[in-house]
Amino acid sequence: MSQHTQDNQINNNETIEIQETDTVPVETNSLQSGLTSLIPMILIFAVFYFLLLRPQEKRRKEREKLVSGVKKGEEVLINSGIYGIVTKVSENDNNIEIEIAKDVRIKAIKSAIVDITSRKREVAATQENNKKNKKVSCAKSS
C-alpha cells in the first residue's frame, strides 16, 4: 500500500491547471489572410493599368483622330518614310492616294500615316507669330 500512496502523491504533485481563454475562430483568420494576399495583386494590376494600358489607349485614340481627319492637300509622312501630299481620300475603303513627286502617285491605307507634317508647320507658324506679336506689344508698352 505504501507504493500506492506514493503514486497518488506523485499524481497530485504533477497536476496541470488549464485556464480557459477567449479564442478567435479559425475561419476569420483564414479569410483575413486571403484578403491580405489579394491586396498586392490588386495593387500590381492598378500600377500596370495606369502606367501601361491607359497611356496606350490615349495614344490609340489620338492616332485614330489623326488618321480619320486627313484631308486632300495635306502633307503626310507614311510609315515607310515617304513624304507626300494627299491627292485623294477614299472614305469607304480606307485608302488614300499620295503624290510623292510630280505625276508620281501611290496608294496607301490610312493607318500607314505616321504624321501630318503640314499641320505641324501650321502650328509652328502660329506659335512663331504669337511670339513676334508678344515682343512687339512689349516693345510698344515700354
From Swiss-Prot:
GO cellular component, one term: plasma membrane
Cross-referenced InterPro entries: Preprotein_translocase_YajC
Membrane topology per record: Single-pass membrane protein
TM annotation in the entry: 33-53
Signal peptide (from-to): none
Keyword set includes Membrane: yes
Role played: The SecYEG-SecDF-YajC-YidC holo-translocon (HTL) protein secretase/insertase is a supercomplex required for protein secretion, insertion of proteins into membranes, and assembly of membrane protein complexes. While the SecYEG complex is essential for assembly of a number of proteins and complexes, the SecDF-YajC-YidC subcomplex facilitates these functions.
UniProt-annotated stretches for the region Disordered: 1-21
Subunit-level organization: Part of the SecDF-YidC-YajC translocase complex. The SecDF-YidC-YajC translocase forms a supercomplex with SecYEG, called the holo-translocon (HTL).
Keywords: Cell inner membrane, Cell membrane, Membrane, Protein transport, Translocation, Transmembrane, Transmembrane helix, Transport
GO biological-process terms attached to the record: protein transport
Primary localization class, coarse: membrane
Similarity remark: Belongs to the YajC family.
This protein's name: Sec translocon accessory complex subunit YajC
Compartments in which it is found: Cell inner membrane
Pfam family, one: YajC
